[in-house]
């Protein structure tokens, strides 16, 4: 779709040191953006005390973030479609840098929320362009591996970034954590500007993107986005309360709870590179296996929740289900985004933007539904997750050609 300046996407040796460096920069961008997004999770109490507001009010920062990202993603992607892809990425990272600086200096909650809105606006733009940039750096046969490589940054944000900012918030204050994220975001923005090709669109390619382009109905893309929204909703119904699930359903408490949370994140970190090659060769099979595993994990946790008995055996089964959940929830995301981009034809950025919007809607819907069901029982909450995952799995299984790689045109190399 783009013509990368100084980079050949048709080389027979795609994983050169230069391209590995470029993909690492993209992974760092994903890492710092996700770390900034979830920073309030580990700093809830510290922010609440410092700004003299309730913990509940601070918690709304995440919900409003998802709402702003969902509303602004598609319009912003269309508005910037004619930009070189590197510019869109760097602008997103600069906005993140400014946002974190505003947050670090915020004298009150309103200013903090305003700072968060700035990076929420460009959240969707970054996630709409980052995966397409990765796929354009390598041949089409390596697109899945390129996409999964940037999700390593997402996994590291959960395993390293979030715990690190949480620890800094507890020991030295949340403002210092925000300052550190500011510096890291600025460094990644500079690295992206220096390491990545400009990726300018040709005149014929501009006909397929932007505000003036015609966007015919794409049932395949719509179906991928709807199934993504259902699956993400199912995940976030329970993920918001994963600590409670580990404690009250699995029966793991104290220091072991923290270790199991870490295992959840590490499992996701390990799973991402493992699914890269299968995603390129058997995209539908890889997605079906991942969704089947997620459905099985939620079904097992549901059974344990209804059982209400804690034994060594149930703790072992529950631990396995949590680790499986962590591994596959992280692995399925790049699978679905790859499917969305393949469905987008000549406009993978626009397709990726619609995917990001569906993902953000799923986050909001899952958090809302999870809160309502949590007040009733954990068993009902987990049942909803298992049911929604089952619905998404069924839709993906019966859909024809949903995850197939389209036939490449000669010009695609």
From Swiss-Prot:
UniProt keyword Secreted, yes or no: no
UniProtKB keywords: Antibiotic resistance, Cell membrane, Membrane, Transmembrane, Transmembrane helix, Transport
GO cellular component terms attached to this protein's record: plasma membrane
Molecular function GO terms recorded: transmembrane transporter activity
CDD domains: MFS_NepI_like (cd17324)
InterPro entries documented for this protein: MFS, MFS_dom, MFS_Efflux_Transporters, MFS_trans_sf
PROSITE patterns the record matches: MFS
Residue ranges of the TM segments: 23-43, 55-75, 89-109, 110-130, 150-170, 176-196, 226-246, 256-276, 286-306, 312-332, 353-373, 378-398
Keyword set includes Transferase: no
Reported induction: Expression is negatively regulated by the transcriptional repressor MT1396.
Stretch forming the signal peptide: none
Principal subcellular localization: membrane
Subcellular location, record wording: Cell membrane
Annotated function: Active efflux pump that plays an important role in chloramphenicol resistance.
Family statement: Belongs to the major facilitator superfamily.
Protein's name in the database: Chloramphenicol efflux pump MT0201
